[in-house]
Structure formats: C-alpha cells, structure tokens
Amino acid sequence: MIGRIVSRLPDRIGTYYEPFFGGGAVFFEMARQGRFKRAVLADLNPDLMNCYSVVKERVDDLLSELRGPAYVYNKEAYLAMRAMGTASLSPVQRAARLLYLARTCFNGLYRLNLAGEFNVPFGKYENPVIVDEPALRAASEALQKATLSCADFSEVLSGIAPGDAA
C-alpha cells in the first residue's frame, strides 16, 4: 500500500509537507528513497510531536531512558506508566512513555478518554520489542531534514510553493 501512495508523488520534491503526520509511513519511505530536500511534518497531537522531536534531537537520551527499570514488560509496570501524568515529565520521559505504551498496549492502539488520559488496556505479547535501537536511529537520521510542529493542517500547508508536495 505504501508503495502505491509514494508512486503517485513526484520523484524530486523541494519540500515535502505532511500535515497529518501520525505514524509517518509516507515520510519515512520518501526519506529512505531520498526524494525530498527537506520536510515539514505536523500533527495536532502534542505528545506525538514531542516524541518525534526527541527522536530527532535526543535519540541517545531516549534510548537510555527506555532501558531504565520503569520500562519493563509486565502488567503492573504498564498500569503504573499508563496512570502516570505527563505534566511533571521531561520531554525525553514523555517520549519514552509514549513509545513504551505503544509497544505494550493492546494492538498498539493510541486512544485518550474525554479527560485526555491514555486508556488502552494492557497488551498480552510474548516478548514485545520496547527498545528498537536501529529503528530509532534510522528515524532520527530521517528526521534531520524535517521541521516539526504541532499545528493545524491549514497553517502547515500555507507555506507550500511550486516544486513542493503534500
């Protein structure tokens, strides 16, 4: 599916815009193929964009945090991490929390309740990969050409010019 989407985009792009970044599948494939000079990536989810910012700028700190004792795979640790508020966490801790929850929750689902709290149940996996160092380092490298923002799509696309693509 990703190949079909990417094949519809120009081969060479000045700036690639992705206003609904989410998981970033199109961006990461375009980056792998070297099809743009720079990228503007945005999403309205502040936790998600913080995570990408940390992956881009502080991947070593993130890897170190994820290897800490709080990020073990068991139901008690998961529930404690899920219940933890994010206001007092550093950007690196917030990013690690998001990655941990995504790797250990039911089906990798991201869902917030009306109070803005992550409320996905614990996922039952044999041995989930919580720290995927090669993937995080590759993502960090790809993100070096990107400007990241937590913004509305109309604001993001206002800078598009000839030779750019979204």
Residues of each region from the PLM?
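SAM cofactor-binding core of SAM-dependent methyltransferases
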Residues: S7, R12-G85
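SAM-dependent nucleic-acid methyltransferase catalytic core
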Residues: M1-I2, D11, K56-A166
